[in-house]
């Protein structure tokens, strides 16, 4: 068996920062801080190896583990000068989880372990403060009871509140020694009621606590968190056992969390909060609203504890310069002595990540490549958060702490269950006293989070920032009744289902729906995206059909349009009647008449698009979807169509019935339409090329056209369509006495097209892989119907991910690789692109880079994500 226990503390450490897979994120940090000679409580880390052994051996420990554990405790007793379980000089322990990947609040912690009546009395004698000793005992009974014995936490809360009410006490700090003794007696009774015993033996407490932490690795909340954040279950958790240091030892003791820069904005100054006379869980749980570390008022640590603040500032600077990244630091102050409990790379908003990365490049701490690799591409969604338009003279009903930026409007809900249930049909704002790890699913589906208690480093704030959701915490001027499902702000009562708006940037709360403004990129955001473009070889284009789409795409840095779905232009209310006439017309003459009516409308659409894009490439796909998408379904629409064609309604119904397809997505669509009804594609070709000519002649705009044929399955279809297309173009060239320049390409979205790509490539200038349909036709799964069984497939690990979100490299990816190799073998100059949902997915973009594609094309709002992902792929793979 590998070594299971590593020491750290004032005498150095057995480990270091590189050992995260063995020691976990927290343990590796403690080891490294020991090596840096920073003030940390002595302790040891039990490696992730124990967790993996535990789960593969029926929840049992290895043979000699108990002996190794006792040896480790003995070493700790020697370095601290205290004895575990002693009735004269007791050593108390903290037992904390520590995954290899940070999972804040998702797993269990037990503080003050080793407590019993005798130890409590000894602690009183050694420190001379009975209230402190009793408070520590009370905390242990509650934490051990909920974490190890699975006693519902609200039962402890009820006992605590009952005694406070009976004694007419409102502040925790006013609780007397006598009242604490009564609360402890009731907590003990609760232990005995649930487990038939009170565990007083310190070693029995320790072993059961270790097992509880190991069990928490597979707790529901931890499993959900890993699933949401794509963290492997195979990592396991380490366990960190340390000598307790006490932040609840009076007015010269405290606990807190500090960030070396702002996790919301990235501003370069120490940021964080602390609580005097408290333990760590008080600040993280959000049950008390903390005070700032640095501020201009007398309640800040800077003002109240200037010497400790100075030392903390120096340590924060040292840690950031050592790790070359922003740090999240947990600390405790015991009688004015500072101890660092943990440091880790801090979670941050997207804008903070960008600002910090740019700052650190400018400070010459890291390179541009390192800066880019620190940006989570998906987190850039946060840059697209809306904000409230305050120019409208709005009045808020309450204000709290701005815990996570962005504005959100939705109906108020008061439980995670209701959030999940109602989010299917509404945007929801989850309103709670404070959130806990059990709320993770409800938080995930909510548009925003509002808590009455807690600060900027509470569970709600940290998780919301990680998810990129707006959050307001610490709204002390609001009151909530979760059972009655009402929120009160003065005379205003908000019930479940009422619409509210929260602003996570200012902390303001509003009744009703507020006007919102779309965000703009900061200069730092533009700069880091420019760095991405400098490095990446895979260009990023947009899927766009409208002028608005094109403008948004250019704003976000698109290098062209990689997919213009021309049929989207047909769904305009002025065009759809003409499209229906074209489809339903019983003879060629009437069809041509409808086509001619559509021609000028489609031409204006293309002109508007080309005008915005100027000389950037615009890849237009000819009409693709099945005709049923355009056909009338209501009686009113059918009657209107009959009138416009001057046909009886019965004939319209006959035509509709004749055109019915059992499986339209694999039926009369794409190039099959263009071959069987050539006048449709002829009209589109004339509209496109006439638009190009008129822009050239009248506005001196030189368009960069790429023309694409959809749903090709064999080279015969290509040859037929090419003949028809060039016939129209040649006629237009003669009419306008102008030579058109363009590229002709095809979608590769059917397996047969991929396999037959050698012949197809000879006929075209480029391939664009339509990965949506290629995935559908490879799997034989409809993208619209996969939701009915996908959750089960993911849960059973039949699929590792949704194949319509992340490209299946083994199946669909192999077809793409076959197609590009065979295509290039017959056409060395063949250009390659990809469009569809996968083109905006970072993991899929990495695959496209490895395949040496020229570009990807995604929705406008995925462009920043794709630009960063493209650069990261280049940095990783060259």
Swiss-Prot record:
Transmembrane intervals: none
Q: Where does Mg(2+) bind?
A: 749, 773
Catalytic activity entry:
pyruvate + phosphate + ATP = phosphoenolpyruvate + AMP + diphosphate + H(+)
List ligand-binding residues for substrate: 565, 621, 749, 770-773
State the residue spans of region: Linker 2: 503-537
Q: How does it assemble?
A: Homodimer.
Task of the protein: Catalyzes the reversible phosphorylation of pyruvate and phosphate.
Q: What is this protein called?
A: Pyruvate, phosphate dikinase
Q: Where does this protein come from, organism-wise?
A: Rickettsia felis (strain ATCC VR-1525 / URRWXCal2)
Q: Which gene encodes it?
A: ppdK
């Amino acid at each position: 068996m590998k070594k299971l226990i590593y020491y750290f503390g004032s005498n150095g450490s057995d480990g270091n920062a590189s050992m995260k897979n063995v020691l976990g994120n927290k343990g590796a940090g403690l080891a490294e801080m020991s090596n840096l000679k920073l003030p940390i409580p002595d302790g040891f880390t039990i490696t992730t190896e124990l967790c993996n052994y535990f789960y593969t051996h029926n929840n049992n420990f290895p043979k000699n583990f108990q002996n190794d554990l006792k040896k480790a405790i003995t070493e700790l007793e020697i370095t601290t000068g205290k004895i575990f379980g002693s009735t004269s000089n007791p050593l108390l322990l903290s037992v904390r989880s520590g995954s290899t990947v940070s999972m804040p609040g998702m797993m269990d912690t037990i503080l003050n372990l080793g407590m019993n009546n005798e130890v409590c009395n000894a602690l009183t004698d050694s420190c001379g403060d009975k209230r402190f000793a009793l408070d520590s005992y009370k905390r242990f009974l509650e934490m051990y009871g909920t974490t190890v014995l699975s006693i519902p936490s609200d039962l402890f809360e009820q006992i605590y509140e009952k005694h406070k009410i009976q004694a007419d006490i409102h502040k925790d700090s006013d609780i007397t020694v006598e009242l604490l003794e009564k609360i402890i007696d009731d907590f003990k009774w609760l232990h005995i009621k649930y487990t038939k015993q009170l565990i007083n033996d310190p070693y029995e407490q320790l072993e059961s606590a270790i097992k509880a932490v190991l069990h928490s690795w597979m707790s529901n909340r931890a499993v959900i968190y890993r699933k949401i954040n794509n963290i492997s279950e195979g990592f396991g958790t380490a366990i960190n056992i340390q000598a307790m240091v006490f932040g609840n030892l009076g007015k010269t003791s405290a606990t807190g969390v500090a960030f070396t820069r702002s996790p919301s904005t990235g501003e370069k100054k120490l940021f964080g909060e602390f609580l005097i006379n408290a333990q760590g869980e008080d600040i993280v749980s959000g049950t008390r609203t903390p005070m700032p570390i640095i501020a201009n008022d007398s309640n800040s640590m800077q003002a109240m504890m200037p010497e400790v603040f100075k030392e903390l500032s120096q340590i924060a600077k040292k840690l950031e310069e050592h790790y070359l990244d922003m740090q999240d630091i947990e600390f405790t102050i015991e009688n004015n002595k500072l101890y660092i409990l943990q440091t880790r790379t801090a979670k941050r908003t997207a804008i903070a990540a960008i600002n910090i990365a740019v700052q650190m490049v400018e400070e010459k701490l890291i390179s541009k490549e390192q800066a880019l690799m620190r940006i989570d591409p998906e987190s850039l969604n946060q840059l697209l958060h809306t904000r409230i338009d305050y120019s409208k003279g709005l009045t808020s009903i309450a204000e709290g702490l701005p815990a996570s930026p962005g504005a959100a409007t939705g109906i108020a809900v008061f439980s995670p269950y209701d959030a999940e249930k109602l989010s299917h049909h509404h945007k929801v704002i989850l309103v709670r006293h404070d959130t806990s790890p059990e709320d993770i699913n409800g938080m995930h589906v909510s548009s925003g989070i509002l808590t009455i208690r807690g600060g900027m480093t509470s569970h709600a704030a940290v998780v919301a920032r990680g998810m990129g959701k707006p959050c307001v915490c610490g709204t002390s001027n609001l009151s909530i009744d979760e059972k009655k499902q009402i929120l009160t702000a003065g005379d205003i009562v908000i019930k479940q289902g009422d619409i509210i708006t929260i602003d996570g940037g200012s902390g303001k709360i509003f009744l009703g729906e507020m006007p919102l403004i779309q965000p703009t990129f900061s200069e730092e955001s533009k700069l880091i995206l420019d760095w991405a473009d400098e490095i990446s070889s895979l260009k990023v284009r947009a899927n766009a059909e409208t002028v608005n789409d094109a403008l948004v795409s250019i704003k976000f840095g698109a290098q062209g349009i990689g997919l213009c779905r021309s049929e989207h232009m047909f769904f305009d209310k002025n065009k759809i009647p003409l499209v229906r006439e074209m489809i339903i017309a019983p003879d060629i003459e009437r069809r041509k008449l409808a086509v001619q009516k559509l021609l000028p409308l489609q031409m204006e659409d293309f002109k508007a698009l080309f005008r915005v894009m100027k000389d950037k490439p615009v890849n237009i796909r000819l009409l693709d979807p099945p005709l049923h998408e355009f056909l009338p379904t209501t009686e009113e629409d059918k009657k209107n169509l009959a009138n416009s064609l001057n046909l009886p309604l019965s004939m319209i119904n006959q035509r509709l019935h004749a055109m019915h397809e059992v499986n339209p997505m694999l039926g009369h669509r794409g190039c099959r339409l263009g071959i069987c009804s050539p006048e449709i594609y002829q009209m589109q070709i004339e509209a496109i090329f006439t638009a190009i000519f008129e822009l050239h002649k009248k506005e001196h705009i030189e368009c960069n056209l790429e023309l694409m044929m959809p749903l090709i399955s064999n080279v015969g279809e290509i040859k037929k369509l090419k003949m028809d297309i060039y016939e129209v173009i040649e006629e237009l060239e003669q009419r306008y006495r102008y030579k058109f320049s363009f590229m002709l390409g095809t979608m590769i979205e059917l397996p047969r097209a991929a396999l037959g790509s050698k012949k197809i490539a000879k006929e075209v200038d480029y391939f664009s892989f339509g990965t949506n349909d290629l995935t559908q036709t490879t799997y034989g799964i409809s993208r619209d119907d996969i939701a009915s069984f996908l959750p089960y497939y993911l849960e059973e690990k039949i699929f590792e991910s949704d194949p319509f979100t992340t490209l299946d490299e083994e199946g669909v990816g192999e077809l793409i690789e076959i197609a590009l190799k065979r295509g290039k073998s017959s056409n060395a100059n063949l250009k390659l692109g990809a469009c569809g949902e996968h083109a905006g997915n970072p993991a899929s973009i990495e695959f496209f880079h490895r395949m040496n594609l020229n570009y990807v094309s995604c929705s406008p709002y995925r462009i920043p994500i794709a630009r960063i992902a493209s650069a990261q792929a280049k940095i990783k793979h060259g």
